[in-house]
Every structure is written in structure tokens, then in C-alpha cells.
Amino acid sequence: MATHGMIDLETLGVEPDSVVMTLGAIKFDPFSDAEPHTPLYLRGDVEEQSEQYNRSIDDNTLAWWSRQPQAIQDEAFGEHTDRVTVQEMLRQLNKWCVGLDYIWCQGPTFDFVILQDLYKNAQKPTPWNYWQIRDSRTLFAMMPSDPRKAIQEELHNALADCYYQAKCVQQSYKHFGVTNGR
């Protein structure tokens, strides 16, 4: 059984040094219909990232968040007591990444780039190699229609996004007849 991981971030900007509000991750086997498993969901300490790590907050992104439904805003910005430090976020993500064959994100220049910058800020190496990186956006663009449109019920929740993206990778592999890891 292959073990791939899907990661998604919700951030306060689109630049590599943007504050990470939430990180979602889920493991899955792209070659089967098995349910994604081993979820990880972390809320980052926004104040620590901004003040101690000098990570950025973009006004346009804040304005975009203000136009989202209230439930989504509450999940992202609410007074949650479980927010973790950068060091703790990276420690838990490192532990979660153990045993992954490949790691996916929705697009090659957002989540991966922001995470790589966060690891660099924390003076830690990323827990994946460059050759393990996979991009779901490109895969979905090759489908007759975007598979996320048919199944995704919740938007802008990092863990929910991961779940739906993992399920769509499975559907895409099945559509294209991909049966092995090469």
C-alpha cells in the first residue's frame, strides 16, 4: 500500500513569508478508494509568527477573509486555545511525515513554498525531499472536469480541503488507469 500525504494551509497572505493560520494534512493511498486517514490539523500562533518570526500579513488577504462566511472566519480567526508555536507545528508535521512516499499540495508554488520558508525561519530542514513533491492542481486540470466541484462541501478549512483533494487524486488516478507508483 502506498502512503501519500496531502497538505493544505490557510494563511494571511500569498507570499512565502505569510503567517500560517491553519495547517491540515491527511494520508491516503492514491491507488485505491480507501478513505484518507491519519489527519493532522494545527492552528498556528499568529502573534508569534508575526512578532518573533517576522512573517507577513497581507491587507488584501485579510479583506478576502472578511468576505468569507462567518463559520469559516470563526474557524480561522476564533479565539482557539489550541494554537501552537512554530516549533510545535513543525515538530508535529515532521512526525506526521514519517513514512510518506510522496507529498501533495494544491499547486507547486503556494503551500510548499510557504512551508519551506517557515522551516527556514525556524532553522530546520523540511521533512521531504524535492523529488517527493506532487501537485494536485496540475493533475486535476487534466481531468475532463475539476473533480473537486462534484464532491467538495466545505471550503477554506485546511483539513477538509486535504480530504477532498486526496479523494480527487484517487478519482484522477482511477480515471487515468494509474495502478502503480511510477
Model-based region annotation:
Residues 3-5, 10-105:
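Conserved non-catalytic scaffold segment of RNase H-like nuclease domains
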Residues 92-95, 113, 117, 141, ...:
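Residue-level signal for well-ordered alpha-helical scaffold segments within enzymatic catalytic domains
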